[in-house]
């Protein structure tokens, strides 16, 4: 774990995922199923793989290119637009990651997707977004307010927020 933490920037790992792992390592089981919503090229799932997790799932509208990962690194991947719903059972995943995805979701689909993310979460959910620092005519980051996402999740009685960093737009959630 120390080696991963020391090399997280070079490997592109989320420091917030590392903080989560460091805080809750004693509560985690290597048999947990982990879903990465908007998984990209599996960067975050590979972090969990390096720690010994094997039940890794990813969903994204784009096909990932894990060519630099070892052959034994396997992800159960579904290519799908996540705004159309997550094709998983309720509480199917002990850990759900959603890193730097929500800011690309149209507002009309955002809360439906949040409901779906929470629906498939059995224990923990980690959410990170990125502030839009300036308006661009053809920018991909859509206008949203992170504090609205936080308030929405706070309104869900079956979840508690275990860490939040409003300014950095980071959130850890646990199902109660």
Language-model regions, residue ranges each:
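Short, conserved SAM-binding segment of the class I
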Residues: 112-116, 120
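A conserved beta-strand element that flanks and buttresses the S-adenosyl-L-methionine
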Residues: 97
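Short amphipathic alpha-helix with an adjacent loop that forms part of the alpha/beta core around
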Residues: 86-91
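Acidic donor-binding loop of glycosyltransferase active sites
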Residues: 94
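Class I (Rossmann-like) S-adenosyl-L-methionine-dependent methyltransferase catalytic domain
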Residues: 1-32, 37-85, 109-112, 124-176
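Helix-to-beta-strand junctions that scaffold the AdoMet/dcAdoMet cofactor pocket
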Residues: 105-106, 121-122
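Short catalytic micro-motifs in class I SAM-dependent methyltransferases
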Residues: 100-104
